[in-house]
Design a protein with these regions (language model features):
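Core catalytic lobe of class I
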Residues: 1-166
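Extracellular/periplasmic ectodomains of large secreted or surface enzymes and adhesion receptors
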Residues: 164-176
Length: 176
């Protein structure tokens, strides 16, 4: 999906903003790593096996003359553009029919990379509660807020179903 127009570029992406209060922030790119693309011989280098049976590629950076070894069983830190996460399909189990709902895989990558286990995730525009649900599934604490009562109801229902009989301390507050 995305905006189409004859007078501008088609808008086919979302932008994720990454903010930190200080220069000391949590980032674990390998926790959100993606499978390495081995490419072709010309782009990825020759795949070899080391003395322990692990597959790797050596890559030469021509500008510096340095070689780097990348093991294929280790995840690669993703770039800042992702094409490996698909939109939510109409028959998907995670779909809650909320108009701005994002795929859980997208939020999982962001949360794993930017919040430690037992850390706190805050979604100021929680919508359907996807961010909060993914935080819960990945052992992070969470806070959510939304001005839209429908969003609060949708997110609360989703989290309640996910939690079922757990003793969690889930509270919903109306501040209007």
């Amino acid at each position: 999906v995305g905006g189409k127009g004859s007078d501008r570029w088609a808008r086919k992406h979302d932008t994720i903003f990454f903010y930190s209060k200080t220069s000391k922030f949590y980032f674990d790119g390998k926790a959100a790593g993606v499978k390495r693309d081995t490419g072709t011989k010309s782009t990825g280098g020759i795949i070899r096996t080391d003395e322990n049976g692990r597959l790797y590629q050596d890559k030469l950076v021509k500008a510096s003359g340095k070689y780097y070894r990348y093991y294929l069983d280790e995840p690669k830190i993703p770039e800042d553009w992702w094409t490996d996460i698909n939109s939510i399909q109409s028959g998907s189990d995670e779909r809650v029919d909320y108009p701005t709902q994002k795929p859980e895989a997208l939020l999982e990558r962001i949360i794993k990379a930017s919040c430690p286990i037992n850390g706190l995730v805050f979604d100021f525009f929680m919508g359907s509660g996807t961010t909060l649900a993914v935080a819960l599934k990945n052992k992070r604490r969470f806070l959510g807020s939304d001005i839209n009562l429908g969003a609060v109801v949708t997110a609360t229902k989703r989290l309640t179903q996910l939690l079922q009989d757990s003793e969690t301390g889930l509270h919903v507050f109306n501040v209007n």
